[in-house]
Amino acid sequence: MFKEFKEFIARGNVIDLAVGIIIGAAFTAIVNSLVADLINPIIGLLTGGTDFSGHYLVLKGEVPPGASLQVARDSGASVFAYGAFLSAVINFLIIAWAVFLLVKAVNRVQSAASRQKEAEAEAAAGPTQEELLTEIRDELRARRT
């Protein structure tokens, strides 16, 4: 059983998946920082200078005026946290765009490699048996005349 597990782990696709998950987690941290530290402050300037991710509406309950989203949640109030949601949407769009560009680049590389292999296979294959026999026949006819 240990041997099977070792073979399973040693497969390239499992290791690739693990590397992808680790890089994805690191990339998510970068995107979260990009949104929280760069994009949200700019949006905040456009919307009155407040932290955009902390914007919310109180649906039910009592919340002191000007309280943060965390204070509103801690007080037990029902809140519509549209700022946090929009931040999550921005995060998603940035990650989706980056993944799209990555997949597009990988597909381009794979396509180029595939075309190169096809060209090499055609060049290495040379003439078919039928083509060789036709050439021999034509050569023999040319010698007879």
Curated annotation (Swiss-Prot):
Entry's transmembrane regions: 14-34, 83-103
Any one Pfam family match given in the protein's UniProt record, by short name: MscL
Membrane topology qualifier: Multi-pass membrane protein
A GO term from the CC aspect: plasma membrane
InterPro entries in UniProt: Mechanosensitive_channel_CS, MS_channel, MSC/AndL, MscL_channel
Main location: membrane
Keyword list, A-Z: Cell inner membrane, Cell membrane, Ion channel, Ion transport, Membrane, Transmembrane, Transmembrane helix, Transport
Subunit: Homopentamer.
HAMAP family reported in the protein's UniProt record: MscL
Role: Channel that opens in response to stretch forces in the membrane lipid bilayer. May participate in the regulation of osmotic pressure changes within the cell.
NCBIfam families: mscL, PRK00567.1-4, PRK13952.1
PANTHER family, alphabetized: LARGE-CONDUCTANCE MECHANOSENSITIVE CHANNEL, MECHANOSENSITIVE CHANNEL MSCL
Family, per entry: Belongs to the MscL family.
Protein name (database record): Large-conductance mechanosensitive channel
Species for this entry: Paracoccus denitrificans (strain Pd 1222)
